[in-house]
């Protein structure tokens, strides 16, 4: 109550921020007449003037009025478009490390040119991040003329570009690309074997378009570069045959382990668990199939991988549905993004889940992979000095943006008042009744010439609606993961009079639906159109546009509520752009997933009290409130999971930063011999201490063990027992010194053979390769630790603190192993002649260049909904697969098995 009163008196933080910024907008508007007088050359010269002022110590924020006025004028001359005042506000919000919520159709792409230009003046680079390659290319090419007019360079960062082209793109003042590609380049740079192989500069300023999609929806998605692991495809096939024989428990009571069925399903957290009966049943079937020995337990340590196969197969059969979570195309399982409805070609679920789905569908099973490098989007984007983003729907996630990314959300007002009518939800008892009502609504509206956009949450649902429309004789177009090639075209024409378009979820995001259709698309189909043809097309469009407005504008139909209010708002936001007329309504049934899982008891109770008859709908504020509360519950739990994942990942992030920092220092230094010498002393001291304890009696020494260790691990033949027998005066200190000096002398002989420079290169290569190999193993060990750490809670221990403590101990052990491995490899290596080493280096360079041209990226993602502790790491992973005989992704030019795949 008190907060509401204070807000009424002083205004909200959002209002105060906008009031402050409007004063700057007024200043920019006052500058406009003067800027208009400048010639093109004088306008372009302003960029050099701004750069000079920055070099002389000016603060970037002091340039905002002039810089924005210059960009606005340049836009008028290049595009014939003038930035609205609200776009200037949006530009200032984006410069202040904030999220700008700007409604659909308000010109976010043009708004982004303002902060992009301003922050590029420092010469440190600006990354404009989009959700797909099409938008990255489109926005870069559309805005290139403006930036080049002002003397700035523009680069596009796309998958499969050769390294020199990527380096040039990053060297540009403003670089457009996708979140995936920026993240993968960061990982690849930290696998490089020379400074020249890196492509990115320091991460300065990132401007993220559709920021909610990237920083919220994909927050659980790690980017992974991986290599091949052991082939176990046969086991997936054998286990897959057993799963259909298991029976689901009918009642999901609290005691799932003691249930009557073989497995229970927790739909809220998307988990499946074997019951006691199920465990006995699966063990019997595994024994019958000859997979497990009689009397063995599935939970015994020897069968841990078998348990992994059973769990993956059970999840594949029960939780993942064809044409909802994935499609099968050309003998391949392709994931469908739950947030956009788009197919994610090349992405794969991790932890054997994808292989289990492939076995279920009877397609070829691809090998599992082992992580070489990994980072989540949460941690990647927090590496930027300055981060900002824009979207049409951010306010519902404002708390998460603030708590995780330290980004405030500012709602930017629309240029024209929003007049869309958002009608109350209609709730039916059954899915069939709901679909019937939707068809009738579409029939009535299209009869009046009103275009309709139907939003569904899955391919399966879109095909059900499509089939019913076909049966009713209503023409329509379907836009889902199966037909996404024509996405932009279908969406742009969805505003034609009487058009009916079915869109899975938020497919087509980034393309506006213009009432009356897109006249630009019609002109694009003509070869060299005349002015008369263009005028005729525009005139015909104007008639259609006016007719659609008269019919009520675009009508949005949601076939069910999404778990997140934000996704529902995105669907609604397709109508009512730039002050146009429009309307929206959601149709729900008690059989919808959200209603069934979260709101069923309360709403069905209301419906019974009201005496609902078949075909009747309930429309009541209580129902709308119950649904909103259900969505808040899901959003809250999703946020808690993302936050928990981040807390765990922050531990790995600190270690990643330390490793990558050390690695970059190694890359930038030509001579690492001092480091090698220091490490050698530490390693030999540790080895000798384990056989000859400090200040111990000679009877306690294990001389034979020490001789064997030096021979096996360092290829050093040292007759220590003979020395002690021949030289009674040889004591502990002098013995230690002799062993170390002989090891150094042996190494120096090798250096004399190959030469100083070659040995320095070799040392550097061994250190980098060993570091990468051990880091890869450490990542796998961290994953295993993470999977079981929640069990510490049963021992009254805090799992997070235990994870931090143990992961630090593992990290320290890894660094000790690094020292040991490096000295061991350098001591045992058989050196080549300088000519051979040089020839190998030339070959490596040539292969690295060839690799850059042929690199193929594939990504891995898990769009499974919610996960509990032990399942957290099964979260989505974007993965790049590398075969044993493929070129190593680090860019060394060697085969993977001879480079990062060697020291395993």
Curated annotation (Swiss-Prot):
Coiled coil: none annotated. Pfam families: P-loop_SecA, SEC-C, SecA_DEAD, SecA_PP_bind, SecA_SW. It is found in: Cell inner membrane; Cytoplasm. Keywords: ATP-binding, Cell inner membrane, Cell membrane, Cytoplasm, Membrane, Metal-binding, Nucleotide-binding, Protein transport, Translocase, Translocation, Transport, Zinc. Transmembrane segments: none annotated. GO terms for biological process: intracellular protein transmembrane transport; protein import; protein targeting; protein transport by the Sec complex. Induction: Repressed under conditions of excess protein secretion capacity and derepressed when protein secretion becomes limiting. This is regulated by SecM. SUPFAM superfamilies: Helical scaffold and wing domains of SecA, P-loop containing nucleoside triphosphate hydrolases, Pre-protein crosslinking domain of SecA. InterPro entries: Helicase_ATP-bd, P-loop_NTPase, SEC_C_motif, SecA, SecA_CS, SecA_DEAD, SecA_motor_DEAD, SecA_preprotein_X-link_dom. Its main location: membrane. It is a peripheral membrane protein. May bind 1 zinc ion per subunit. ATP binds at residues 87, 105-109, 512. It is an enzyme of class 7 (translocase). Residues 853-871 have a biased composition (Polar residues). GO terms for cellular component: cell envelope Sec protein transport complex; cytosol; plasma membrane. Residues 851-904 are annotated as: Disordered. It catalyses: ATP + H2O + cellular proteinSide 1 = ADP + phosphate + cellular proteinSide 2. Its EC number is 7.4.2.8. Part of the Sec protein translocase complex. Interacts with the SecYEG preprotein conducting channel. Has a central role in coupling the hydrolysis of ATP to the transfer of proteins into and across the cell membrane, serving both as a receptor for the preprotein-SecB complex and as an ATP-driven molecular motor driving the stepwise translocation of polypeptide chains across the membrane. This is Protein translocase subunit SecA. It comes from Yersinia enterocolitica serotype O:8 / biotype 1B (strain NCTC 13174 / 8081).
